[in-house]
Amino acid sequence: MLCLPVFIILLLLASPAASNPLEKRIQNDLIRAALEDADMENDPRSIIDSVKTFCCSTFNLGICCSKK
């Protein structure tokens, strides 16, 4: 009777769905390093400028086209 629960626990530990904390940390570090290398950070000002340019060229509204 003890054999079945032990087998199930060992099966769960050996399954690929069980996450390995070290692997997860390494993957997170690699993703972070890749994003830093690719300089994937968005500059909020450039996004706002892009939206304003699109709004001004498409809708020609005074709100979008106003220069400060």
From Swiss-Prot:
> Which tissues is it found in, per the record?
Expressed by the venom duct.
Quick one: signal sequence residues? Answer: 1-19
Q: Could you tell me what this protein is called?
A: Conotoxin Ar5.3
Provide GO CC annotations from the record: extracellular region
Explain the post-translational modification. Contains 2 disulfide bonds that can be either 'C1-C3, C2-C4' or 'C1-C4, C2-C3', since these disulfide connectivities have been observed for conotoxins with cysteine framework V (for examples, see AC P0DQQ7 and AC P81755).
Q: Which InterPro entries match?
A: T-conotoxin
What one GO molecular function would you report for this record?
toxin activity
> Domain comment, in the record's words?
The cysteine framework is V (CC-CC).
**Pro-peptide region(s):** 20-53
Q: Which UniProt keywords apply?
A: Disulfide bond, Neurotoxin, Secreted, Signal, Toxin
The protein's superkingdom reads Eukaryota
Its localization reads: Secreted
Q: Which residues cross the membrane?
A: none
Family classification: Belongs to the conotoxin T superfamily.
